[in-house]
């Protein structure tokens, strides 16, 4: 009987190794399919939507394979179905849990487009369309939202950022920057309107009695950072006096503000 040579032994060894790898892979897949199934779905960070709404929007359910879900697809589905969600982070926790961390976008303003009114967040993303006068969604009070004036809009698709008409892109950018700065300073609830019709004369209504004149967009952050202490001083010196707060001369090196009673 012939004895296998080294080359034949090497081929036999390689075959056994390959077979072993295949068996291990199949065992791992089988084990994952049988044991790594979703038993619990936890939702964190939601206040505008119920846990059931987020779970339904995710498309996940108990019994699905934990490792066969696509986190990016799940996140996209949630953001498409629930416009007030700006981000959804999907985490797997062995052996059987999925955690969905939701970040919501608070409503900030209202814009008019094609005879309808749309709710937007501080980044200019459209959250909802207002239907009729008796609008109610997630406890929103329409009168508490900022009216955006002087912006020509080309598209207002729910879940997407506003698109300005050709030539009005700068106005849209001005609005986004102002809203973002207001959100940082926490003053959005105190603002009644923002007028972006003139990029050299940006202004907004504040606390119901003041018109805050920003002028150009330059030094916007500095202007809004000094607004609250400026108003506190004005209230002390001119109680209950409406007027214009001119911040056009505020820069990163000076906080020169003028108040003109009206």
Where do the PLM segments sit?
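Short extracytoplasmic
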Residues: 49-76, 80
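Charged, solvent-exposed interaction patches on well-folded alpha/beta domains
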Residues: 2-32, 36, 53, 57, ...
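Extracytoplasmic/periplasmic mature domains of Sec-exported, cell-envelope-associated bacterial proteins
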Residues: 71, 75, 81-89, 97-99
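Extended, alpha-helix-rich binding/interface surfaces that flank or overlap catalytic cores
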Residues: 43
